[in-house]
A protein has these predicted regions:
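Short beta-strand segments
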Residues: 21-59
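A generic local secondary-structure boundary/capping motif
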Residues: 16, 93, 143-146
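A generic structural signal for short beta-strands and their flanking turns/coil linkers
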Residues: 23, 38, 49-53, 69-73, ...
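Short, structured beta-strand-loop surface elements
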Residues: 60-118
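C-terminal edge-of-domain segments
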Residues: 110-197
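Short, basic/aromatic recognition patches
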Residues: 2-26
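Short, solvent-exposed cationic patches
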Residues: 1-7, 50-79, 133
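Residue-level recognition of well-ordered beta-strand positions that form the cores
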Residues: 41, 56, 76, 107, ...
Length: 197
């Protein structure tokens, strides 16, 4: 991903936090030279000394069959984004778009059933733990658990991580503050999240 230096984030701890907060991502691979993508909730996990992006695809989704032939796949995590009007600047200029995004590159591997079950347990814990009647794997019926046969687990070893936080850091202090103030005035929740970033 092209990232001007002032928008680059290199701290992996910041990236991990962002991925945890924006975990619905896009996995991109190629099949016969054509890009294909799937949108899925993913986890970032440390397994032994390496970091992986983990998740699952429907067994009927043909993308998982491309992973063996792809030396690398791309995973895109998109955060909040918002239009920035040039009317918010103290001088004439062009409008822009502010956003946060992370690109992960790595080799995708299929999980065995035990690894997949462990990943599903963690996924349920992440999204259910704060709920009043939370669902946990151990309490699911064997009939429900058998639905695991309909999905394929995937783990992507992180070889490279790129993060872009384009948040008007290149503007002077007056314009920067004006942008934040105007973003808070927008009705779009994304604009508020960009202002808070």
């Amino acid at each position: 991903m092209f990232i001007p230096k002032q928008f680059q984030i290199t701290d992996f701890e910041i990236m991990k936090e962002f991925i945890n907060e924006n975990s619905f991502a896009t996995i991109v691979s190629t099949e016969h030279g054509r890009p294909i993508a799937t949108h899925v909730p993913l986890l970032i996990r440390q397994i032994e000394r390496e970091y992986y992006i983990t998740g699952h695809l429907a067994y009927t989704n043909p993308q998982w069959k491309t992973f063996e032939d792809n030396k690398q796949v791309l995973v895109i995590f998109q955060g909040p984004h918002a239009y920035v009007s040039s009317s918010w600047y103290s001088h004439e200029n062009v409008p822009t778009w502010n956003y946060q995004s992370i690109h992960i590159y790595g080799k995708a591997q299929l999980m065995n059933e035990q690894e997949l079950e462990e990943d599903l347990i963690l996924l349920l814990q992440k999204y259910e733990r704060h709920r009043k009647n939370s669902i946990i794997w151990e309490k699911l019926s064997s009939k429900t658990k058998r639905q695991i046969k309909g999905i394929i687990g995937v783990k992507i070893k992180i070889n490279e991580a790129q993060a872009a936080y384009k948040l008007s850091q290149n503007r002077n202090e007056e314009d920067y503050q004006s942008i934040i103030d105007h973003l808070y005035e927008e009705t779009d929740i994304n604009a508020h999240q960009v202002a808070e970033a």
